Amino acid sequence: MASPEHPGSPGWRGPINQCRTRTRQEVLPPGPDLPCPGPEEAQDGPSSNSSMTTRELQEHWQKEKSRWKHVRLLFEIASARIEERKVSKFVMYQVVVIQTGSFDSDKAVVERRYSDFERLQKALLKRFGPELEDVTFPRKRLTGNLSAETICERRRELREYLRLLYAVRAVRRSREFLDFLTRPELREAFGCLRAGQYARALELLGRALPLQEKLTAHCPSAAVPALCAALVCLRDLERPAEAFAVGERALRCLRTRENHRYYAPLLDAMVRLAYALGKDFAALQSRLDENQLRRPTHRDATLKELTVREYLS
């Protein structure tokens, strides 16, 4: 007999059914740039009365220094191909992004047209004009755009352009730069999710997420909507173990963001997945209950209700 104490039972009275829907729908935190956590936010440093030796302290702070060292990304225009439409031909450039400092098994690959780069340049000039005076954008050519020589030269120029942009801190953390590299794939992925095309959505998320996580390493919560979308797809494709693993990644991104709009819906989904998988969900349920006690008058949307509202424009 189903018990009301168990997720998914008819009498289940989880906080998802007891709170009020919030309407804030920004994908990233408000403001032009993403917040940048730093060493001052670390909570696991040695206390003032620590018994660690001098050498141990040196090793600890060396690890802390490495932990907060800025992640460097390398950009390469790996290849180019000519796309032919009914009334036009244009070149698609394959952009590969690799993280330095360690073996990167999740190199990110996207394709963009010259016109996409051009729109990015215009948006960045509008916002960061003076800071881009040393950044050279490849000039537009009226003829010969499809010649092998021109394509090869432009590949080198676009690679250098991305390198110079990334060197400007304000630019690499800007919404414009992030959207240029991730928004087309994410928008299509969330559109597929809304249409119930979960396999296709997962494929697109698999391409976009590694890059989004690299670009927002200073703000892990920025990747939470996409991670939760992957959870929803995997769950609805009846792949609960994989869905649970993705959910754990999302929860790690929110470990200091308990007021985040995805926090309670994600916990609720994880409780239900844990129960379905036969896992101990007591700790997850406890976190969910504590969150509900802090916000007794709120009703959260379900995780799926949240994700289908993303990237509507």
From Swiss-Prot:
Keywords: Cell membrane, Cytoplasm, Endosome, Lipid-binding, Membrane, Nucleus, Phosphoprotein, Protein transport, Transport
Intracellular or extracellular location(s): Early endosome membrane; Cell membrane; Cytoplasm; Nucleus
Region of interest called Disordered, as start-end residue ranges on this chain: 1-60
Null allele phenotype: No visible phenotype. Mice appear healthy and normal. Neutrophils from mutant mice display unchanged Selplg-mediated cell-cell adhesion and Selplg expression at the cell membrane is unchanged.
Phosphoprotein keyword on record: yes
GO terms for MF: phosphatidylinositol-3-phosphate binding; phosphatidylinositol-4,5-bisphosphate binding
Binding site for a 1,2-diacyl-sn-glycero-3-phospho-(1D-myo-inositol-3-phosphate): R113, S115, K140, R154
PANTHER family referenced in this protein's UniProt entry, alphabetically: SORTING NEXIN 20, 21 (PTHR20939), SORTING NEXIN-20 (PTHR20939:SF1)
Quaternary structure annotation from Swiss-Prot or TrEMBL: Interacts with SELPLG. Interaction with SELPLG is controversial and was not detected in PubMed:25882846.
Comment block on domains: The PX domain binds phosphatidylinositol 3-phosphate which is necessary for localization to the endosomes.
Protein name: Sorting nexin-20
Organism: Mus musculus (Mouse)
